[in-house]
């Protein structure tokens, strides 16, 4: 420890605050304390390897005095978020979790995003993108908030969503009704769902009393669909409870998010060397997750009154329902730990089998899909620590005159790894020919990486021009089959979309009166020929603004 650091520690103030160890002006560790003097004196006699490294590397110590522990906690969280010091524990997402963002524009729009920034009102994170899409679709039908990002001042007439009754039309002056739609959406996503359910029930009953059974059925269906979307998360509690439940073991943290009696998400994070207080700082105080009124833990936290941060209660269960939720969270945690144990075992076996130097933490998988050489596409999927990392998935469109899987693989490998770092292991769906094509492509760009394949016939592992036959229940084979199936699924889904869009373009080109703008609208709205075939004349006419041309389209189809 440098002498000037020792002197600063001995002169540290008694007040609460934040301390920052720096090396060459860069923060390497940031901490908080009720009493800076007491906390910093513990660094004079390091008890762990981490503390020893901090004091050995630091050439500067800065302290910031604040009024109370709450201010220290928030300041610590903000500084860690800003500087990301290397010795502070970090929260690592084990999956990609979506947020719902309401923009901060004068007339806001609503969208699904991957990251939480300071540019609007955010809700989440949620467990599934599909769940969020389904939820927003039904809520938009009920409320009519806008999802377009268009400059409203330049719009002369409303889009098809307005004509379908899914948008209030702020672009044509319906500002107040749109503001009300956004308010109701915020209330709903904050957990106050009763207002929307009561509104739908009232509308259904009113139309029923008026013998307007068509509209009564419409609101009944909206009510049922909304309930079904929420229940699709798997758990509904009789009591209208809203809370988060946090459990952890080792470096893994699991949070169950319950809003108004519905389980809206289960999320898991890794935090090496972190405790519950670290998690609250990294997840809630730094703004990654909404602060709920109630946070259920396995035991009390003694150090701080978290109500000053926005929580009304932080602690162990107070009711049978909360106890049940805690048990559910524990079971989810046990399952996550079990899965991680199995995946780690499979990865270790894979490392031994292929005689790899590095642990295969990141595996990238490639597959090619085409139809007799047409509409060729490639998928690239990513597995980290044995689990899919969907936010890193990529798709590639390949132009070629004749079908050639080997050349397609070479093309994708060169495009990908000329610009991106290599994974620990590259997986290719195929046998020796496909694997060799990937190896050759890497050599052409001066790169080297282990490449493994899985031959479709008898599911044989292919590596370095040799075939390895494994028992069907071998953990390595199960892992490689999962990666193979995921690359195939992702490639086929992209190929299908490309084929359908190309077919749709081809048909639309033959319809008189369909120019580039109308063609783009039809493709964006319907996506496939099948969807247009099943649409009504009125719906197609609303999209393109012409009943006559809509009739021509249906005649061609």
Swiss-Prot record:
A Pfam family cross-referenced in the UniProt record is GIY-YIG
Q: Where does the UniProt annotation locate this protein? A: Cytoplasm
Q: Family assignment?
A: Belongs to the UvrC family.
Subunit comment for this entry? Interacts with UvrB in an incision complex.
Primary localisation category: cytoplasm
- Name the job this protein performs: The UvrABC repair system catalyzes the recognition and processing of DNA lesions. UvrC both incises the 5' and 3' sides of the lesion. The N-terminal half is responsible for the 3' incision and the C-terminal half is responsible for the 5' incision.
For the UVR domain, which residue ranges apply? Answer: 194-229
| Name of the protein this chain belongs to | UvrABC system protein C
Cellular component terms per the entry's GO annotation: cytoplasm; excinuclease repair complex
Which keywords does the record carry?
Cytoplasm, DNA damage, DNA excision, DNA repair, Excision nuclease, SOS response
**CDD domains linked to this entry:** GIY-YIG_UvrC_Cho (cd10434)
Q: Entry's Gene3D superfamilies? A: 5' to 3' exonuclease, C-terminal subdomain, GIY-YIG endonuclease, UVR domain, UvrC, RNAse H endonuclease domain
To which species is this protein native? Thermotoga petrophila (strain ATCC BAA-488 / DSM 13995 / JCM 10881 / RKU-1)
Q: List the SMART domains hit by this protein, alphabetically.
A: GIYc (SM00465)
Q: Say if the entry is tagged with keyword Transferase.
A: no
GO BP: any one term: SOS response
Instruction: Report the residue ranges that make up the GIY-YIG domain in this protein.
Output: 14-89
Q: Which domain of life is it from?
A: Bacteria
> InterPro entries recorded for this chain?
GIY-YIG_endonuc, GIY-YIG_endonuc_sf, GIY-YIG_UvrC_Cho, RuvA_2-like, UVR_dom, UVR_dom_sf, UvrABC_protein_C, UvrC
Q: What is a GO molecular function of this protein?
A: DNA binding
């Amino acid at each position: 420890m440098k002498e000037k650091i020792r002197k600063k520690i001995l002169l540290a103030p008694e007040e609460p605050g934040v301390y920052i160890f720096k090396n060459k002006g860069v923060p390497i560790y940031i901490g908080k304390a009720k009493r800076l003097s007491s906390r910093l004196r513990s660094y004079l006699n390091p008890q762990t390897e981490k503390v020893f490294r901090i004091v050995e590397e630091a050439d500067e110590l800065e302290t910031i005095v604040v009024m109370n522990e709450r201010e220290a906690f928030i300041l610590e969280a903000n500084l860690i978020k800003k500087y990301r010091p290397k010795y502070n524990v970090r929260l690592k997402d084990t999956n990609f979790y979506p947020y719902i963002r309401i923009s901060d524009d004068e007339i806001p729009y609503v969208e699904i995003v991957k990251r939480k920034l300071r540019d609007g009102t955010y809700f989440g994170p949620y467990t599934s993108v599909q769940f969020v899409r389904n939820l927003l679709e039904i809520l938009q039908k009920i409320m009519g908030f806008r999802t377009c990002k268009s400059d409203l001042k330049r719009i002369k007439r409303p889009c098809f969503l307005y004509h379908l009754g899914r948008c209030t039309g702020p672009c044509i002056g319906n500002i107040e009704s749109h503001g009300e739609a956004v308010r109701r959406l915020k209330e709903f996503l904050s957990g106050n769902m009763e207002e929307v359910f009561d509104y739908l029930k009232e509308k259904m009953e009113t139309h029923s009393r008026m013998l307007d059974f068509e509209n009564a059925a419409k609101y009944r269906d909206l009510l049922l669909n909304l309930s079904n979307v929420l229940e699709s998360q798997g758990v509904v509690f009789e009591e209208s409870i809203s809370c988060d439940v946090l459990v952890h073991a080792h470096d893994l943290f699991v949070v169950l998010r319950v809003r108004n009696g519905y389980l809206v998400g289960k999320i898991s994070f890794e935090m090496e060397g972190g405790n519950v207080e670290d998690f609250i700082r990294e997840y809630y105080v730094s703004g990654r997750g909404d602060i709920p009124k109630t946070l259920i833990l396995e035991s009390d936290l003694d150090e701080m009154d978290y109500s000053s941060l926005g929580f009304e209660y932080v602690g162990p269960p107070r009711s049978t329902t909360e106890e049940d939720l805690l048990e559910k969270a524990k079971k989810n945690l046990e399952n996550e730990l079990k899965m991680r144990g199995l995946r780690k075992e499979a990865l270790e076996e894979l490392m031994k089998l292929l005689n790899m130097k590095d642990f295969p933490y990141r595996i990238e998988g490639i597959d090619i899909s085409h139809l007799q050489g047409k509409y060729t596409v490639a998928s690239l999927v990513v597995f980290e620590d044995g689990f899919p990392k969907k936010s890193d998935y990529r798709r590639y469109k390949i132009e070629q005159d004749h079908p050639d899987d080997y050349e397609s693989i070479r093309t994708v490998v060169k495009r990908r790894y000329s610009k991106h770092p290599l994974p620990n292991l590259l997986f290719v769906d195929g046998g020796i020919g496909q694997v060799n094509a990937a190896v050759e492509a890497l050599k052409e760009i001066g790169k080297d990486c282990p490449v493994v394949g899985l031959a479709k016939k008898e599911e044989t592992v292919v590596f370095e021009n040799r075939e390895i036959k494994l028992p069907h229940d071998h953990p390595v084979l199960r892992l490689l089959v999962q990666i193979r199936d995921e690359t195939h699924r992702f490639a086929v889904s992209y190929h299908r979309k490309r084929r359908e869009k190309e077919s749709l373009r081809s048909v639309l080109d033959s319809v008189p009166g369909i120019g580039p703008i109308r063609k783009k609208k039809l493709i964006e709205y319907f996506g496939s020929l099948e969807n247009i075939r099943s649409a009504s004349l009125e719906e197609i006419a609303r999209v393109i603004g012409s009943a006559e041309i809509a009739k021509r389209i249906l005649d061609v189809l």
